[in-house]
Amino acid sequence: MVKKRIYELAKELGISSERVIEIAKKYDFKVTNHMSALDENEQNKIRGSISLKAKKKEHIQHNKNKDNFHSKKVQKSNTGSKDENNHKNVHKNNRKRSGSSMKENNNAKNGQRNNRNNRSNNKFKNKRNNNNKRNNNFKKGNPVPPRKNKPLPETLVYTVGMNVADIAKKIHREPAEIIKKLFMMGVMVNQNQSLDKDTIELLAADYGINAEEKVEVDVSDIDKFFEEEQNNTEHLEKRPPVVTIMGHVDHGKTTLLDKLRHTHVTEGEAGGITQHIGAYQVRHDDKIITFLDTPGHAAFTNMRARGADITDITVLVVAADDGVMPQTIEAINHAKAAGVPIIVAVNKIDKPGANPNHVMEQLTEYELIPESWGGDTIFVEISAKFGKNLDELLDMILLEAEMLELHANPNQRGAGSVIEARLDKGKGSVASLLVQQGTLHVGDPIVVGNTFGRVRTMVDARGYDIKKATPATPVEITGLNEVPDSGDRFITFEDEKTARAAGEKRAERALLKERSQTNHVTLDNLFDTLKEGELKEVGVIIKADVQGSVEALAQSFKKIDVEGVRVNIIHQAVGAINESDVTLAEASNAIIVGFNVRPTPLAKQQAESDNVDIRLHRVIYKAIDEIETAMKGMLEPEYQEKITGQVEIRQTYKVSKLGTIGGGYVIDGYIRRDSGVRVIRDGIVIYEGKLASLKRFKDDVKEVKQGYECGLMIEKYNDIKVGDQIEAYIMEEVPVD
């Protein structure tokens, strides 16, 4: 017995599933919805019922046509008698008119008086009669033209989550009709409710059309697009190499680049040290080389951390008189970690104490062995100051680039990375980009990191306006809504609407990610964190001047136990607090305790930016008490006063039920709505309290800066006078040393 579902039988018979269910229920078949199955006998009965009804319908239609034909004949024969009756009626009407003419003459005067009223009444009557005529047309059964549905499409292209209203538009049907169908299927929805994949496909099957799912591409995933563009191997062409110059401070990196591009960067920079990242191009033997000039290795590392591996070759500059220095080793490690080939430029060979061989010996310890010694590292002895052997260095760079076989497709959409970015007062957001794939054009909609916009202007490395930039070309663009981060990737889109949607979505995700990040523990928030159950142990890094102090602190901390929460010593060592300690504390959410030691300037700066808590002590028991007290929630923060601004009262206004309003001018700093204030008259503090309100014109504001006027009221004080000085201050928390 071949069973068939109701919706399949309905499709075969060319009727709706509801109609089949209705017939099936008349025969007492056990059916519930369009998915119910029918056996062969049940199917035949339904088919028979449909065919019988079709015959009846045909018979009725035939009889109806007969009746219509007969009625038309009758109407024709009656037309003659109607004409005779009309002729008689004309004579009767003429007699009536002659008899009534006398009455009309007598009433003429009265008619003139009531003429005005009659006009208005006639208008009302005509309007009412017209409405009645319309209503009578419907009452008489005049046929209303039926609404014609557009034909169903062959395929319904849908996305998961579409609502009934969207589907109705796609298949040219009313939402009410679809809701009714879904109700018959046992699905209760309204027109704005999202539908899942199965429901949409069942609905399409019920209408007898195909369903095709359209998978939506996440336009905000620019990393995916970037990789697709990178992996596109069609129409590849040779591109210039991108070279980064690295090395120890004052070993001549910028001087070398200055000589290579024939400009004077060094003279214009403070102390001869590079102050920003730049990208420049040099032409040698009719070939172009792109150089990146970094202010330090941190920028290189940050770019790598963001996935921007933009460098093809690293030129390691080592001074022949100084040899290998700490930053030289750091540069080697960064280049090796990035998997970038290294060319060593031994600089300052013109100096009296220069010893290039000693440099080569030192670098062998770091697996950089010269080709002349049987290795594979290119060494070039140069003098950046006098321009000696620079052509040879460029030749070696081009040779290395040839070995790397660098290619890109300029015929696809532009993609690349941010070298640097800044906010310019006149231009707005300005970003230096390196095009890595495709071609970037002026006017292209673009997404850069979590920002978006349209390329408004584009300037090359020489400062000239250009219309397009091909692979390995550094450019400076304007037109972004915000300033991106160095190392961010960029990609262009076909239209600005898509670019905006992608940029806004990325910015939203970044904000959510930032909010969801773990707050670093400090002694001030330690008790609250423990109370919330977020922390089961307190991580501590101990640094002291001698080993004995380190061990004494470690042993004492281990003995602290507050409500089952213990102290975990993550790291302990002798010496100053350095960047590595801060990085470890940031990663492990720990507190740094220093005893008779201080943090290095860089470590202090990093701790402030990473929100890592450093506590410095000279007495051991105070350090122990501080940790224990913080864990018990009894540590009181210390505050100090900070003067933020001064306001001069130039006019006063008395307002009933409110008090005295002082019209002032901010002569220094700023005043905030939440600031504490002092009223100073002739150098004497008259009153100290808080602001009740702060306004600019009629608007309440949070802050008024120097050079602007404001209106203010002080809580519980109405004796403000012209000439008074209002001193604004805030209380800042002081870190415990």
Swiss-Prot record:
Cellular localisation: Cytoplasm
GO MF terms, alphabetically ordered: GTP binding; GTPase activity; translation initiation factor activity
The keyword Ribosomal protein appears for this protein: no
NCBIfam families per record: IF-2, small_GTP
Record's compositionally biased regions (Basic and acidic residues): 60-70
Function, as annotated: One of the essential components for the initiation of protein synthesis. Protects formylmethionyl-tRNA from spontaneous hydrolysis and promotes its binding to the 30S ribosomal subunits. Also involved in the hydrolysis of GTP during the formation of the 70S ribosomal complex.
Residue span(s) of domain tr-type G: 238-407
Region of interest (Disordered), residue spans: 55-152
Annotated Gene Ontology cellular component terms: cytosol
Protein name per Swiss-Prot or TrEMBL: Translation initiation factor IF-2
Matches recorded under PANTHER family: TR-TYPE G DOMAIN-CONTAINING PROTEIN, TRANSLATION INITIATION FACTOR IF-2-RELATED
Family to which this protein belongs: Belongs to the TRAFAC class translation factor GTPase superfamily. Classic translation factor GTPase family. IF-2 subfamily.
UniProt keywords, alphabetically: Cytoplasm, GTP-binding, Initiation factor, Nucleotide-binding, Protein biosynthesis
Residue segments, region G4: 347-350
Binding site for GTP: 247-254, 293-297, 347-350
Composition skew (Low complexity), residue ranges: 105-121, 132-142
Region spans: G2: 272-276
Sequence ranges of Basic residues compositional bias: 88-98, 122-131
Chain segments carrying region G5: 383-385
Region (G3): 293-296
Entry keyword NADP: no
